[in-house]
Amino acid sequence: MVAWYPVSTAANGPGFVPGSNCTPTGRFRVWKKIGRGARMGTIFRSREAVGHWRGETCEEDLILSRILWLDGLDAANGNTRERYIYIHGTNQEERIGHTASHGCVRMTNRDVIDLFRRLPEGAEVVIEATALGVILPPLML
């Protein structure tokens, strides 16, 4: 392991079923990177920049700063891309380290920008159910 980032994964725990709001585990590749050059705090909806979050408190689970859209490499997680499972920044950084998402992997905005910079499309990442973190293989950094 070369890098580890604290994250927030699904409040519903790990899983692979569409509509379950669970975070899939296993091996993935970064299928698509979205948000290159966007300001920290840029709000994305349907993978399009639609505004900027200014730090105000809100209950909505915003997708911020960068998106790394994942594609599953294992039989069990092969539907990940179609489930729109991302690694992304969040407006709820205080919940990092706790299960809180609707299936995506949330990171602090600084960390997701750093990860976005480090990983090319096609890079492999591992999500484990035993730790609230994302592991990156040595050759990708």
Predicted regions and their residues:
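Electropositive
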Residues: Y5-K33, A38
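Exported/periplasmic cell-wall-interacting domains
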Residues: G19, A38-L141
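Local beta-strand/beta-hairpin segments that build beta-sheet-rich folds
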Residues: M1-V2
